[in-house]
Amino acid sequence: MENTENYLECERNRVYYTLIAIAGFFGAYTFLLRGKVFCNAQTGNLVLLGLAIGQAEWETAAYYLFPISAYMAGAFISELLPNPVKYHLKIRWDTLLIAVEMATVLVLGLVPESAPVQISQVAVNFIASMQYNTFRQAEGTPMATTFATNHIHVS
């Protein structure tokens, strides 16, 4: 058994389990309540995009480009921000990201049902991508907090 005292707080198992729950919430929220799009990961959206293209449903295919693009943007931004954040704000990127996720959940809770679903989809895709890209291991175990199949594999 490894000594867990040498890990950063963001690498603790309790953080990992919390992030898994958040990603599950994001996926259920956007699929069940916000347009039947998976926003915690993109495999489902890529499959649905491929099906739409295969059936020549161009409008539906274009619809799936929104979440996929937002996810890609989140990954890009999460690669660019850590060093400038640490340098200018004197705070770790992972700590700031947790605060941003909390604020995002709060704001999404205030978005009325009548609002376009793309608002929630883009926000969740963006934040889930940054979560996946930022939190990569828990106590020495590689992790992907937004993919359920990874949790089964790691268990």
Which residues make up each language-model segment?
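Alpha-helical transmembrane segments in multi-pass membrane proteins
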Residues: 15, 19-23, 66, 70-74, ...
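Short, Lys/Arg-rich, polar N-terminal cytosolic tail immediately upstream
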Residues: 1-12
